[in-house]
Amino acid sequence: MQSRSKLDRFLWSLQQLMKIDAMNLVILVIFVLIGWSLISDNIANPARYLPSPIAVALSSVDMLVKGLLPSYFSDTLLRLIIGSAIGLAAGIPFGLLLGLNRTVADMFHPMLNFFQSVSGIAIFPIVVIWYGNSDTTVLIVILYTSIFPIAFNVLSGVREIPLRYINAARTLGASRFQVMKDVLFPGAMPHIATGSRLSIGFAWRAVIAGEMLAGRQGLGWMIFTGQDSDKTTEIILGMVIIGFTWIILDHYLLRPLEERTIERWGLVQR
């Protein structure tokens, strides 16, 4: 009953937070639209440099009717889901395995930090040399940008677990797998939650950049072809969709999951 009550309180708090965030977002959007319209109405050749919100809205309707916008959006979202899922599925166990040995963990920690700091855009040229302009290239870059942040965060979390907990488990006869499952994994859960949010954020940027540079479909490709054909409305439409999609994913899915995970594992005051 107590856990049920906590869940109910969490869901209620989440609902209130979503209402407040949604209200703030609406107010912000209204101000942005007003400013955007004023600038567009007072510049030369707005159709080329900064189309009005109405022009962008009409462009979105046209692309919806033609079926292009749903196709581009679903392609991008599918790449994000596949790339992030594989990256998390590989990065979390990798970080935990490295954490089984404290010496190995200390050795690999700077290496993971190094690869995490090298952006996916930086490795694009060499991946294009290997695989050309293809979906494989885009997927590899998404994997690269998502796997190292989560592995680094997991390993950082494991390194913060007191050695006495690990030694106590081994003294009681726990196998390496049991130590990883019963000690390292629970102890690193807050870092796993934070790392997952960070990893998916990097993957979202990577999929857009990948589609622009090496893809043939998706929102990134829509922006790239818009620039190529001088269709500024499509470029701005793509930017708006990218921004709002991430706001929805981060504020209404990833952040609540992260906060709930941290609260569940007792690292904040309840």
For the regions a language model picked out, list residue spans one by one.
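Hydrophobic alpha-helical transmembrane segments of polytopic membrane proteins
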Residues: 219-257
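Transmembrane-helix boundary motif in ABC transporter permease subunits
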Residues: 82-112
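Transmembrane alpha-helical segments of polytopic membrane transport and secretion proteins
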Residues: 1-30, 253-270
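Periplasmic/extracellular loop-to-transmembrane helix junction in inner-membrane transport proteins
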Residues: 9-18, 41-85
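Short hydrophobic, aromatic-rich alpha-helical segments embedded in or entering the lipid bilayer
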Residues: 51-61, 65, 204, 214-227
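Generic hydrophobic transmembrane alpha-helix motif, especially the helices
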Residues: 113-149, 156-157
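Short cytoplasmic-facing helical segments at TM-TM junctions of multi-pass membrane proteins
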Residues: 153-195, 223
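Transmembrane alpha-helices
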Residues: 140, 144, 176-210, 233, ...
